[in-house]
């Protein structure tokens, strides 16, 4: 069974998002073992100088990096990432599984993004959309997409 970890910066505060994520975790049970792990976001003053923002991003990246398992296929969500269709991403996951890579980690950065040191470690930079979303909403969007990918992989109705 495929193991998927979702690493996030910051605590999920909105109840409606938590309920949606919980629903997708339940739906994914037959397909993959999915766990979500949060690291605390670092305080960053509004309108902070670039150097301060870089320090904050690096501190968050260091916390995330400690949670990475050796050998995991690392997908970093990034606005500058590659845009793939749901079908293409499902195919990518299926290809990884067939080649023996059954451990995937997705990273969702905080409100000021991720440090380059972490982005550079990615096996895949993935953009879910050209639109900008709050990082907490991205968790729910990612969960829905992961569920959709597995429905596509198993040729089950849902994604049409």
UniProtKB/Swiss-Prot annotation:
Disulfide cysteine pairs (residue numbers): none
EC number(s) per entry: 2.1.1.177
Top-tier EC class: transferase
GO CC term, one of those recorded: cytoplasm
Predominant location: cytoplasm
Swiss-Prot/TrEMBL catalytic activity: pseudouridine(1915) in 23S rRNA + S-adenosyl-L-methionine = N(3)-methylpseudouridine(1915) in 23S rRNA + S-adenosyl-L-homocysteine + H(+)
Residues holding S-adenosyl-L-methionine: 77, 109, 128-133
Positions of transmembrane segments: none
Cellular localisation: Cytoplasm
GO molecular function: rRNA (pseudouridine-N3-)-methyltransferase activity
Pfam family, one: SPOUT_MTase
Keywords annotated in UniProt: Cytoplasm, Methyltransferase, rRNA processing, S-adenosyl-L-methionine, Transferase
Family: Belongs to the RNA methyltransferase RlmH family.
Functional summary from the UniProt entry: Specifically methylates the pseudouridine at position 1915 (m3Psi1915) in 23S rRNA.
Subunit structure comment from the entry: Homodimer.
Protein name: Ribosomal RNA large subunit methyltransferase H
Lineage of the species this protein comes from: Bacteria, Bacillati, Bacillota, Clostridia, Eubacteriales
């Amino acid at each position: 069974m495929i193991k998927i970890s979702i690493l996030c910066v910051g605590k999920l505060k909105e109840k409606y998002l938590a309920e949606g994520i919980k629903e997708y975790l339940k739906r994914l049970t037959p397909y993959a073992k999915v766990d979500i792990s949060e690291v605390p976001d670092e305080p960053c003053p509004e309108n902070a100088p670039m150097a301060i923002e870089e320090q904050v991003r690096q501190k968050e990246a260091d916390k995330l990096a400690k949670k990475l398992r050796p050998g995991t296929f690392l997908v970093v969500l990034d606005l500058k990432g590659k845009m793939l269709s749901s079908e293409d991403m499902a195919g990518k996951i299926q290809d990884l599984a067939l080649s023996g890579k059954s451990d995937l980690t997705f990273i969702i950065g905080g409100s000021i993004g991720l440090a380059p040191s972490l982005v550079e470690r990615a096996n895949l930079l993935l953009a879910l959309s050209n639109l900008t979303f709050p990082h907490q909403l991205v968790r729910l969007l990612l969960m829905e997409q992961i569920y959709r990918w597995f429905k596509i992989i198993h040729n089950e109705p849902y994604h049409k």
